[in-house]
Amino acid sequence: MTEQQPQRFERGTDGPKVIVAGLDGSDSSMRAAAYAAGLARRQNAMLALVYVQPVMTAGAALGVPVGDTTGEVAEDLVSEIRAATERFSDAWDLRWEFHTFRGDPYNGLVTAADELKADAVVVGASESAGHRFIGSVAVRLVKAGRWPVTVVP
């Protein structure tokens, strides 16, 4: 007789179970969320929408209370993102969660993907010209090589 082993987590079996989509309020991130939602619906996966509140160091140099400024901007953006996710989740039968972190977008997405045991990560292409020289969050996620990463233009 064969002894049964307790079921344990195994990445990449029978399609993705958790898809993480990074949001920052940009048009490309909203397109990425819509793409990820379609993928999650077709795969019957859970969609985890992740917004990482950036730390504004420039505000501190100008004497602005960083915590207050970041918090106000973040709350407005979080409200906008929540409203958008409610709109498209009502259209489809879709399991989803909304997560928000504070700090660096790359590290926030890595933390979220690790904690949620993500099978895939979807992000929007960077809209910043400077990222051609210093690298974007999407490029850093791809180079990490820890999950399949889809970059939506």
For each predicted feature, which ranges?
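Small/aliphatic-rich secondary-structure junction motif
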Residues: 8-65
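Glycine-rich, Arg-bearing micro-motifs that act as flexible, cationic patches
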Residues: 120-144
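Short, hinge-like loop/turn segments at secondary-structure boundaries
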Residues: 64-68, 115-117, 139-140
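Short secondary-structure boundary segments
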Residues: 51, 124-126, 153
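A short acidic, glycine-rich active-site loop
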Residues: 66-80
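Structural beta-alpha unit
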Residues: 1-14, 87-121, 128
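General small-molecule cofactor/ligand-binding pocket signal
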Residues: 50, 97-101, 150
